[in-house]
Structure formats: structure tokens, C-alpha cells
Regions:
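Fe(II)/2-oxoglutarate oxygenase catalytic core
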Residues: 1-163
Length: 163
């Protein structure tokens, strides 16, 4: 896969996406890392990994608590390109305008090993998505989930990038 960082300065679309992620998550926008666009051509994949932190960043930066993966295009169910969670045996196909949202840590602050995930290679076509990670020094929120919601994953219906 290939990646590019999207800078906020002077870019209203990037600013708006960041504002909506902050509003949805309940975290301050300052906790968001810069948005990162990712592109997968046929045969390109991202091996299973955790988004907890970058070892090069420690101890200077807080660890990642929450991951947003925003799908920019829809891929046919049979075209591969799913986001896979091997430990959970879950595979999610990309659908434009939706986002996969998950905690990287448990409510008690420990690593959530279940969120190991990878990007499967597209068999045909190109997959585009935006990553956003939210960092915090301590779990200042027990969970990103709104009260009354349960489960490991959340999806933003109605298009995160819409007005």
C-alpha cells in the first residue's frame, strides 16, 4: 500500500473531516494525528498489526487509543480489499462514505489484542481510505462509544464526509 499525510492548514475538507471525527469520538481535536490517505493496488496488502503506538514515538507522545478508518470507495464483495481482524474472524468490505471505528485499548487502559487487523489485497480495482488515530496519555474516556451503545466496532452511516 501507499500512504500520504493530509495537512490541515488551508484545506477546508481535511479540517471538516477532523472536526467530525473529534465530535463523534468525544476527544479534543488536538488528540487527533494528521489524516493519512492509504491506497491499495491489486496485490498490495497491509499485514495484520496493532495501531497502539509507534515504538519510535515513545515516551514522547501519548499512545493511540482509537482508530478511524474511513472508506473512500466501494469495492465489490468479491474483489478482496477487506479490512480483516484475524483474532475476531471478522472481515469488513470497504463501502464509500462509511468508517470503521475501534478502540485500540480496553476500558481499563490495557491493550486490546482483539483489534489486530490488516488490509487484504484487492483482486481488482484500487482501494482508497483515510486513517485517523487518536492519542491520549490516559484513558480520559472509558470508551469512544456513546452511552447505550455496545460492541467493539462502530460504523458512521450517512457519510462522515458529508455536510
Amino acid at each position: 500500500s501507499s500512504t500520504a499525510t493530509l495537512m490541515t492548514r488551508g484545506n477546508w475538507a481535511v479540517t471538516r473531516v477532523r472536526e467530525r471525527i473529534a465530535a463523534f469520538s468525544g476527544y479534543n481535536e488536538n488528540a487527533l494525528e494528521p489524516l493519512q490517505v492509504v491506497r491499495y493496488h491489486p496485490g498490495e496488502k497491509y499485514e495484520p498489526h496493532h495501531d497502539l503506538f509507534d515504538l519510535c514515538d515513545l515516551p514522547q507522545k501519548p499512545r493511540r487509543h482509537l482508530t478511524f478508518l474511513i472508506y473512500l470507495n466501494t469495492m465489490d464483495e468479491n474483489a478482496g480489499a477487506h479490512t480483516t481482524f484475524p483474532r475476531l474472524k471478522v472481515s469488513i468490505p470497504p463501502k464509500a462514505g462509511t468508517a470503521l471505528v475501534f478502540n485500540d485499548v480496553l476500558d481499563n487502559g490495557h491493550d486490546d489484542e482483539r483489534t489486530e487487523h490488516g488490509g487484504a489485497a484487492p483482486a481488482a480495482g484500487v482501494k482508497y481510505a483515510i486513517n485517523c488515530w487518536i492519542r491520549a496519555r490516559s484513558p480520559d474516556r472509558a470508551s469512544w462509544m456513546p452511552k447505550g451503545e455496545e460492541g467493539l466496532f462502530g460504523r458512521l452511516a450517512g457519510g462522515l464526509m458529508g455536510a
